[in-house]
Regions:
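Short solvent-exposed loop/turn micro-motifs enriched in small/polar/acidic residues
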Residues: 30, 89-91, 136-138
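Low-complexity, intrinsically disordered terminal/linker segments enriched in charged
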Residues: 2-15, 131-132, 136, 151-185
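Hydrophobic/aromatic beta-strand elements that line small-molecule binding cavities or substrate pockets
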Residues: 93-98, 139-145, 157-159
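Exposed beta-sheet edge and beta->alpha loop/turn motif
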Residues: 109-148
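A short, structured loop/turn motif at beta-sheet edges
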Residues: 98-105, 145-153
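Charged, low-complexity C-terminal accessory regions
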Residues: 15, 24, 141-148, 161
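A solvent-exposed, acidic/Ser-Thr-rich amphipathic alpha-helical stretch
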Residues: 44-119
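Short, low-complexity N-terminal intrinsically disordered segments enriched in polar/charged residues
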Residues: 1-49, 53, 184
Length: 185
């Protein structure tokens, strides 16, 4: 049984797309779905085709310090390189709430990721297998601004309460519990 299902990441957006009649909103949903599929494939170049070269990512994942800010494609590539160094590309972000307007899309839901044991070890957390993956989960809100050309202008990422690293180390995942994304042939 899958614990992490990457296909759930864009499920809510695809369902909304089926009934959305506003052409601008449809384009925004399509861009985010393509973006999410690029993330699921671990294809940074594909992700960047959906993101304006002027985009800014802001991650509020450090509760005691300033947010991490990544401007432009080169820095956004660094953001994804850092992320993929710590977790499996196969992650799930099940969107429970979705707001779409002419300038922004807001997604809120539960994220699950498979953290590399080696990444936990690097944080000083004891794991029984540095080559295994461990389950992290939490709630996230992502604000997706758009430019006039329909390109994503960045992500403002607000992670809510999530798994503490020591708790993650107690949730070792079996390979068959981590779903993988593959394009339809």
């Amino acid at each position: 049984m899958l614990v992490i299902d990457p296909y759930k990441t864009w499920q809510t957006l695809a369902e909304r797309l089926e009934t959305e009649t506003n052409p601008l909103h449809r384009r925004q949903l399509e861009q985010i779905i393509e973006h999410m599929k690029g993330e699921a494939a671990g294809d940074i170049d594909r992700i960047l085709t959906t993101v304006s070269p002027k985009a800014t990512y802001i991650s509020y994942d450090n509760p005691i310090g300033p947010p991490r800010v990544f401007r432009g494609h080169d820095e956004i590539r660094q953001f994804y390189d850092q992320m993929l160094a710590a977790i499996s590309v196969n992650l799930e972000y099940f969107v429970e709430r979705l707001v779409v307007d002419d300038y922004y899309v807001v997604t809120e839901g539960v994220s699950k990721s498979a953290v590399k044991g080696a990444a936990l070890s690097a944080m000083g957390v004891k794991v029984d297998d540095p080559n295994a993956y461990y389950l992290a989960q939490g709630r996230n809100v992502v604000i997706w601004p758009f430019d006039r050309d329909g390109m994503i202008m960045g992500e403002c990422i607000y992670p809510g309460a999530g798994s503490a690293p020591a708790d993650i180390a107690g949730r070792k995942l079996r390979p068959e519990e981590i779903g993988t994304y593959e394009e339809a042939a």
